[in-house]
């Protein structure tokens, strides 16, 4: 198969295929929509049937996976084409055989977390559904042979189809043409002679036509997940008092003798839920109306202050319980400068990490109650309110309490710390998992765990007292001294807590009052604070933990998590790099590698790993890559859920480093050296890799093209790393040679030249006696002469023609003289030729994915941020840009670059304007 690197799409990577997670994160007494008074409804049996993984037994029999999505997909094949409707070149006469494929682990959300070696990168392992059409599949699949592709190359043909004069590395082909699979995204035709997107790499690293196994995506039910840097509001509603206003607001209330009432999160039903009206009346009360002698803290704080109410946010409570284990982190999130005695004005504030920065959230202290009792998170002490107010602040951050229904512990742990969370499927865990957890505990990492839910029973209880589909916090990991008649030594042990805070505890060995405790010395019991209260906390041996739990989450603390003192301490710390980005439909939302023709349009980032890990002998670097989408949970009230996201990693040679960004040809002939194990619709996708020192390209994407969203991408390493965006530099470039035949010859300067006489006659016919052309006169000329490219249009808009005049009107008279008129027509002829080169379907519009190439051909280079801005400004909902809007793009780009260059006299990329000057120039343009 030629040039296709498909990424499979699954719907929940739990290690056992696809399972029903509808029960995850609900409280025991929760009332869910449509089932009033009866608790959360039970999901239908088989709602999320198991989906096996690809087979490692016979790659030749590797079948195709039909992507299951909410919209219809065409799973047919369409003849000998190679993806997106591009023709498949003739196969070489003696194709090289495909090497065998490596297996993909059949379970685990992040199977590569145990420091997968890139030389043995995992690929899919269990049988999948057969090809829907019965089409034969090539008898072998190419293996990237990581870290460097090594499949033999056929001789270079003189040129590739559609790329005249551009010699390309040609990959071995199967003797039968590879079928095209239509995956629901329309073919995007390129110009008849498209510009080379990137030069082929011809160094010591072979280039091969890669046909990797498909990536899958993981679909988590909507009620469980959902969620650039600080430039937009962090919740669905605009918060006027959310950031930095606490002190001034409190002082104002104290001066006026009033109690604070938050206008952004009012005490109404809208702050409780968005999907329906409450089934009963809830009264919002201040702590003084709920309990006598209200306190922020009662005898300090502890994990036992976190008790779950009716809201299905056990994931949040598990993280809050973990937060109490570290006083530094705790008081960063919950500032201690507030209580119900001194300077009390009914106002409190909390701080959460949001996409690279710490955000202060200010709330009033009115809490929802029923019959005078708190209905959501609360403390065991009736007059203690820090936990209830913390939950309210987090609900405000995301728009409502209902927005907190369902989630993963790692999401809240990251918002409390700024760290990055790794997931381990315990059934596929590395043999050193306990050591990993011990080291994580020593670094102050937060940890949680859970059991897979029962697909038929909501929050089913196991015979040992554990709750399925429920989040537990891990509060201690240790080696415990044990002395029995048969054994003396240390036993790996784990302490966990159920946020329900009741008697729903583990009842097996080492449970409360278990006889095993008699073998533990008394001093050890005192050291670990052993008690047997019915408080939801219990101990387990590590072996029982492996046998009964399914997933563990470890939140590694980042530099964002640490105070200045901690950053200068001797404790080992991660090195971190972070960038923000955006997927814009038709421009930078290219979809995954399954969509080869658009994949290269995604944002690209280069990470340079310089030194191997200090304590390892393998000469490799640990890298944790975390891709997080932004502001999705807060938009659940308007039907916006998490996108299905993932990433791929490619090795770069020194020559590759000169190309910015990498184009279609790079990805057509290169295999990824690492990638996210799945595309999944959770807020963050994270994986750990072991890579040789070098340069790597990371391409984050959504699974399907044209899905819009914002994201941040972070890379953590044990040694220093350098990260940069692999993007074009803004400025002028060379005009595409291919448009030269379409351009009129330069107008001779001799006054008696026939061409100049004709142009002068045209100008005089519209200019009149004043010898100048205004925008109305220019519009009449252009509307008549540009009919062939203004398909279905009534002509140029007033704004477009005025901008053309302003571009060349140096004296700002609103009119053009003959020389300016002549220069404008020359520019328009160039832009028209470029547009026709890319409007291959002759529809009068170009696809947004071609905007970068079209502007490059016109001599203008822009980065992704500017392309996104142009697409938002001039693109249609379908991602199309008509001719007059393309001209506006070119005019704006040229005008503002020239305006900047005029003031940047020393080429320092810095220009100075006073306000009057800047407004005059921008308003007139």
Swiss-Prot record:
* Major subcellular site: cytoplasm
| InterPro entries named in the record | C2_III, Calpain_cysteine_protease, Calpain_domain_III, Calpain_III, Calpain_III_sf, EF-hand-dom_pair, EF_Hand_1_Ca_BS, EF_hand_dom
Task: Locate the region Domain IV.
Answer: 749-925
Binding-site list for Ca(2+) 2: 839, 843, 845, 850
Protein's GO biological process: border follicle cell migration; neuron remodeling; protein autoprocessing; proteolysis
Drop me one GO molecular function for this one.
calcium-dependent cysteine-type endopeptidase activity
A Pfam family recorded for this sequence? Peptidase_C2
Locate the Calpain catalytic domain: which residues? 259-558
Alphabetized PROSITE patterns for the sequence: CALPAIN_CAT, EF_HAND_1, EF_HAND_2, THIOL_PROTEASE_CYS
Give the EF-hand domain ranges.
796-831, 826-861
Tissues in which the UniProt entry reports expression: Strongly expressed in follicular and border cells of the oocyte. Ubiquitously expressed in early embryos. Localized to the trachea and their orifices, and to the larynx of late embryos. Restricted to the salivary gland in third instar larvae.
Residues of the active site:
314, 470, 498
What is this organism's lineage? Eukaryota, Metazoa, Ecdysozoa, Arthropoda, Hexapoda
Kindly list the residues the record flags as site (Cleavage). Answer: 74-75, 224-225
Role of this protein: Calcium-regulated non-lysosomal thiol-protease.
Provide the record's note on post-translational modification.
Undergoes calcium-dependent autolytic cleavage between Asn-74 and Ala-75 and between Gln-224 and Asn-225 to produce two major products, calpain B catalytic subunit 1 and calpain B catalytic subunit 2. This autolysis is necessary for activation of the protein.
Keywords of the record, alphabetical order, are: Autocatalytic cleavage, Calcium, Cytoplasm, Hydrolase, Membrane, Metal-binding, Protease, Repeat, Thiol protease
> Where does the source fall among the domains of life?
Eukaryota
Q: Which family does it belong to?
A: Belongs to the peptidase C2 family.
Q: Where is this region: Domain III?
A: 559-728
The UniProt record lists the EC number as 3.4.22.-
Protein name as annotated = Calpain-B
Residue span of region Linker: 729-748
Residue ranges for the region (Disordered) are: 723-753
Cellular location of this protein?
Cytoplasm; Membrane
């Amino acid at each position: 198969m030629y040039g296709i690197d498909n990424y499979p799409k699954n719907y929940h990577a739990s290690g056992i295929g696809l399972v029903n997670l509808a029960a995850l994160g609900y409280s025991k007494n929760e009332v869910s929509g449509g089932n009033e008074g009866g608790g959360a409804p039970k999901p239908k049996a088989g709602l999320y049937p198991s989906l096996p993984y690809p087979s490692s037994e016979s790659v030749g029999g590797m079948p195709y996976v039909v992507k299951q999505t909410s919209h219809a997909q065409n799973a047919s094949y369409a003849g000998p084409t190679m993806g997106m409707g591009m023709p498949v070149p003739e196969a070489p006469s003696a194709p090289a055989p495909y090497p065998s494929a490596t297996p993909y682990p059949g379970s685990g959300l992040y199977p590569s977390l145990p420091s997968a070696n890139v030389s043995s990168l995992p690929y899919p392992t269990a049988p999948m559904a057969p090809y829907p059409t019965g089409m034969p599949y090539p008898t072998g699949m190419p293996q990237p042979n990581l870290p460097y592709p090594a499949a033999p190359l056929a001789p270079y043909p003189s040129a590739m189809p559609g790329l005249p004069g551009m010699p390309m590395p040609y990959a071995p082909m199967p003797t039968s043409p590879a079928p095209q699979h239509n995956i629901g995204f329309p073919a995007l035709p390129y110009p008849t002679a498209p510009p080379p997107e990137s030069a082929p790499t011809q160094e010591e690293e072979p280039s091969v036509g890669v046909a990797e196994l498909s990536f899958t995506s993981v679909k988590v039910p909507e009620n469980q997940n959902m969620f650039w840097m600080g430039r937009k509001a962090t919740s669905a509603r605009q918060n006027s008092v959310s950031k930095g206003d606490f002190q001034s607001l409190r002082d104002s209330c104290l001066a006026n003798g009033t109690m604070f009432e938050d206008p952004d999160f009012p005490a109404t039903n809208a702050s409780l839920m968005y999907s329906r009206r409450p089934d009963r009346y809830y009264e919002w009360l201040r702590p003084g109306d709920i309990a006598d002698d209200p306190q922020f803290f009662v005898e300090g704080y502890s994990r036992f202050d976190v008790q779950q109410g009716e809201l299905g946010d056990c994931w949040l409570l598990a993280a809050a319980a973990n937060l109490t284990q570290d006083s530094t982190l705790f008081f960063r999130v919950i500032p201690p400068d507030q209580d119900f005695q001194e300077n009390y004005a009914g106002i409190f504030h909390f701080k959460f990490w949001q996409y690279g920065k710490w955000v202060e959230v200010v709330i009033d202290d009115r809490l929802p109650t029923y019959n005078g009792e708190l209905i959501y998170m609360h403390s065991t002490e009736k007059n203690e309110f820090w936990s209830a107010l913390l939950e309210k602040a987090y609900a405000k951050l995301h728009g409502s309490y209902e927005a907190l229904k369902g989630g993963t512990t790692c999401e809240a742990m990251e918002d409390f710390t700024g760290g990055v969370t790794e997931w381990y499927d315990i059934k596929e865990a590395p043999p050193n998992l306990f050591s990993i957890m011990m080291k994580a505990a020593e670094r102050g990492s937060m940890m949680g765990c859970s059991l897979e839910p029962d697909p038929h029973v909501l929050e089913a209880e196991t015979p040992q007292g554990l709750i399925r589909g429920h989040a537990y916090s891990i509060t201690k990991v240790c080696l415990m001294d044990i002395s029995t008649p048969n054994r003396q030594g240390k036993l790996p042990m784990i302490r966990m807590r159920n946020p329900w805070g009741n008697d729903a505890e583990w009842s097996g060995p080492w449970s409360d009052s278990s006889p095993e405790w008699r073998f533990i010395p008394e001093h050890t019991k005192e050291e670990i604070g052993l008690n047997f209260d019915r408080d939801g906390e219990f101990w387990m041996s590590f072996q029982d933990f492996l046998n009964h739990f399914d997933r563990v989450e470890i939140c590694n603390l980042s530099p964002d998590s640490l105070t200045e003192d901690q950053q200068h301490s001797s404790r080992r710390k991660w090195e971190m790099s972070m960038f923000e980005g955006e997927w814009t439909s038709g421009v930078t939302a290219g979809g995954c590698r399954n969509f080869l023709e658009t994949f290269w349009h995604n944002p690209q980032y280069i990470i340079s790993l310089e030194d191997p890990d200090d304590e390892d002998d393998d000469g490799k670097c640990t890298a944790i890559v975390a891709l997080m989408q932004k502001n999705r949970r807060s938009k659940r009230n308007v039907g916006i859920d998490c996108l299905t996201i993932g990433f791929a990693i490619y090795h770069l040679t020194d020559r590759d480093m000169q190309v910015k960004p990498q184009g279609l040809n790079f990805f057509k002939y290169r295999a990824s050296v690492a990638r996210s194990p799945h595309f999944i619709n959770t807020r963050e996708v994270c994986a750990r890799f072991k890579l040789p020192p070098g340069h790597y390209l990371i391409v984050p994407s959504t699974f399907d093209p044209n899905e819009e969203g914002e994201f941040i991408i972070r890379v953590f390493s044990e040694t220093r790393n350098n990260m940069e965006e692999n993007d074009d530099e803004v400025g002028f470039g060379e005009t595409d040679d291919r448009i030269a035949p379409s351009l009129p010859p330069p107008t001779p300067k001799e006054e008696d030249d026939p061409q100049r006489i004709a142009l002068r006659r045209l100008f005089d016919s519209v200019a009149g006696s004043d010898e100048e052309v205004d925008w109305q006169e220019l519009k009449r000329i252009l509307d008549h002469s540009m009919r062939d490219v203004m398909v279905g249009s009534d002509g140029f808009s007033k704004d477009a023609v005025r901008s053309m005049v302003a571009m060349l009107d140096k004296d700002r008279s609103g009119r053009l003289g003959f020389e300016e008129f002549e220069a404008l027509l020359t520019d328009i002829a160039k832009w028209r030729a470029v547009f026709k080169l890319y409007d291959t379907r002759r529809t009068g519009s170009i696809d947004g994915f071609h905007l970068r190439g079209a502007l490059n051909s016109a001599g203008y280079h822009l980065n992704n941020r500017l392309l996104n801005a142009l697409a938002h400004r001039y693109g249609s909902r379908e991602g199309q840009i008509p001719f007059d809007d393309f001209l506006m793009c070119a005019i704006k780009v040229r005008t503002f670059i020239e305006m900047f260059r005029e003031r940047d006299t020393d080429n320092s990329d810095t220009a100075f304007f006073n306000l009057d000057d800047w407004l005059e120039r921008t308003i007139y343009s």
